[in-house]
């Protein structure tokens, strides 16, 4: 019954107004109160402030400043092998694997539509049918900037208005087409591994989604699909990003979905649902060049994995009582 009640709240609560309220509060300068809120947040979610460029919580004027805090340059080493794609975000893998024609795995026994995720853009969807996907959830404790898995030339960006359902174990199991219903920003890149989409998905209390080339994409929330295009590389006005370079950020967190063309990449074999991710670590390898099979993400301490799982609502430690 408790889970049924929680799920009902996802439909009943005014998620847009809650999100606006959270965004308003997170942007306010409140002196000692801001520091108190940040300190409580750090303690509750076990945020490792030693990784931040500014480890002193008093140095953040607003909660948003804290939430998008940059990390020290040395804490996320980048795998520089040109045949290896790297993880775009700190977080936990929700699902990953093969796109089955138009179906992407949302949760065990539940799929959603590739074409719906891409706002009905069947031409873009055709690039990724039978390709590969990875869905990464960023928990509240995580670094909330998103980076490039490989070198890329930006070709298209689409803002898709939508719902603001929370992303967690309960909604993934019970809200049909969750990621294709939520607000999102779709970024399409040309890469040496074929076309790649990197999709930033909103959720309840995600105050804004930003990119490095266009700034804040949402808000405002105008309720209409918006589309931008860019020229190929070497042309005036083109946008080129390097592997490991920041491409966007969330103010209050959510989900990143990566789509890769069929036959272009092999996911690292040890990765699975609930694997903890760190920016710059191996995610996939090229299918066209030999890469040593022992390539793996660097092992993480057990307490770091536990803290990440404890903070992630994707990990369901309670028996479902519905």
From Swiss-Prot:
Keywords: Cell membrane, Decarboxylase, Lipid biosynthesis, Lipid metabolism, Lyase, Membrane, Phospholipid biosynthesis, Phospholipid metabolism, Pyruvate, Zymogen
Gene that specifies this protein: psd
Stretch list, region Disordered: 294-322
Catalysed reaction equations from the record: a 1,2-diacyl-sn-glycero-3-phospho-L-serine + H(+) = a 1,2-diacyl-sn-glycero-3-phosphoethanolamine + CO2
Pathway of action: Phospholipid metabolism; phosphatidylethanolamine biosynthesis; phosphatidylethanolamine from CDP-diacylglycerol: step 2/2
Compositionally biased intervals (Basic and acidic residues): 303-322
Pfam families for the chain: PS_Dcarbxylase
Cofactor note text: Binds 1 pyruvoyl group covalently per subunit.
The protein, known as: Phosphatidylserine decarboxylase proenzyme
Matches recorded under InterPro entries: PS_Dcarbxylase, PSD-B, PSD_type1_pro
PTM per Swiss-Prot/TrEMBL: Is synthesized initially as an inactive proenzyme. Formation of the active enzyme involves a self-maturation process in which the active site pyruvoyl group is generated from an internal serine residue via an autocatalytic post-translational modification. Two non-identical subunits are generated from the proenzyme in this reaction, and the pyruvate is formed at the N-terminus of the alpha chain, which is derived from the carboxyl end of the proenzyme.
